[in-house]
Curated annotation (Swiss-Prot):
Any one Gene Ontology BP term: cellular response to water deprivation
Keyword line: Coiled coil, Membrane, Transmembrane, Transmembrane helix
UniProt feature coiled coil, ranges: 171-210, 256-321
Record's keyword annotation contains rRNA processing: no
InterPro entries xrefs: DUF677
Source organism of this protein record: Arabidopsis thaliana
The protein, known as: UPF0496 protein At3g28270
Membrane topology: Multi-pass membrane protein
Length: 374
């Protein structure tokens, strides 16, 4: 599920450069990024361990990336809930965070669809198991008078399984994955626009801080020049200097300094707040990227399960086609017997993984909404 080339060209260079700089400047973001890299490296290592067939299974890949997505989503939630400044007054930021967790809601919708598919697949498993039980029972039976077809009940159950079809077939999941892709592309564009707004605000504040320093320097210079002028003109000598300089310092230098110092502190506080906004926005951006990876892997996993079930359907076809050939039927049903437990295990694990993942994302989302809406 790759992002469009135009969008990548629009976002990647500036955003990655800004992200790198932000990590170098902000300790918390640097720590967040370091933990993210560590988890990613661990995930890559686990996915590159080859099994005896020379590749990592789609199911294992899903389990690793699903765990990774949960950790990143929780990381984004933790980062946001730790922020205590008034950064949530920034509506652009608030909208961005809400948009991110709206994106995770779309992911939950996909997982719910997969859960429904898993339930249907489990119903199919019951029919397969019943067919296998009948197979064992009918294998021990003697054919009475040549009139009773052996494995008749077995084949009835297999036909029922075939009639159910493939629970992962159709366009439902494909359509939802396309929806999540478009949602993510739209969200990345929003991230890009929000970054620009935040950077403009920071730039303006930095300019204001510079101006206050210039004003302060000019005021100080006026006082200094006035003092020099007093001495140079010899007005009142030291006593006269003191009489004129003291009011100037009190009304000018000290007053300007105090005013500008307060203003500078206020501006710096706002600037730090906006820099924290950038940190949050960067962590949200990372969350989007990882969310995309995880949903892509769910797609791979679904393809894997779909292939397994289609293989089972072919075996069922084989058994039905050879119902008059006892030896061929036995061979096919034996193959089904070997495959059914593996398939059942995979389907169960997928269901449990998706359910756990959904709960964790929903919990993280609730934490964030409570934080920014209080």
């Amino acid at each position: 599920m790759a992002l469009s080339k135009d969008l990548m060209l629009k976002c990647s260079e500036d955003m990655m450069s800004a992200y790198k700089s932000a990590c170098e400047e902000h300790p918390k973001l640097k720590s967040f990024d370091a933990s993210l890299q560590q988890r990613t490296n661990k995930m890559i290592d686990s996915l590159t361990v080859e099994d005896k067939n020379g590749s990592s299974s789609p199911h294992d890949a899903h389990m690793e990336l699903s765990k990774h997505l949960v950790e990143v989503t929780q990381g984004v939630a933790d980062f946001i809930t730790e922020i205590e400044d008034d950064v949530w007054d920034n509506q652009a930021l608030k909208y961005l965070v809400l948009a991110y967790f709206e994106n995770t809601k779309k992911t939950l919708e996909i997982f719910k669809t997969i859960e429904n598919c898993v339930e249907n697949a489990e119903m199919g498993q019951l029919l397969i198991r019943e067919a296998l039980a009948e197979f064992e029972k009918e294998s021990a039976e003697k054919d009475v008078g040549g009139k009773k077809k052996k494995y008749e009940k077995t084949l009835e159950d297999l036909k029922s399984f075939k009639e159910m079809g493939d629970p992962f077939d159709g366009k439902v999941l494909t359509t939802q994955f396309e929806r999540i892709k478009k949602q993510q592309e739209s969200l990345l564009e929003e991230v890009s626009e929000t970054r620009k707004k935040i950077q403009d605000e920071i730039s303006n504040l930095e300019k204001k801080t510079l101006i206050t320093n210039v004003v302060f320097g000019a005021a100080f210079a006026i006082v200094a020049v006035a003092s020099i002028a007093l001495i140079a003109t010899g007005v009142g000598a030291a006593a006269g200097f003191g009489a004129l300089a003291a009011p100037l310092l009190a009304a000018g230098w000290a007053g300007v300094y105090t005013t500008l110092d307060k203003k500078k502190d206020a501006l710096n506080k706002q600037l730090e707040g906006l820099k924290k906004v950038e940190e949050i926005e960067e962590s949200v951006e990372k969350g989007i990227k990882t969310n995309e990876e995880a949903t892509e892997t769910v797609s791979i996993l679904v393809d894997g399960l779909e292939d397994r079930i289609k293989n089972m359907l072919k075996l069922v076809d084989n058994a039905i086609d050879h119902e008059d050939n006892e030896a061929a039927t036995r061979i096919v049903l034996t193959q089904i017997s070997k495959k059914v437990e593996k398939l059942t295990k995979k389907i169960t694990e997928v269901g449990e993984s998706v359910e756990d993942h959904s709960k964790l994302i929903a919990k993280a989302r609730l934490q964030v909404l409570q934080k920014i809406n209080r």
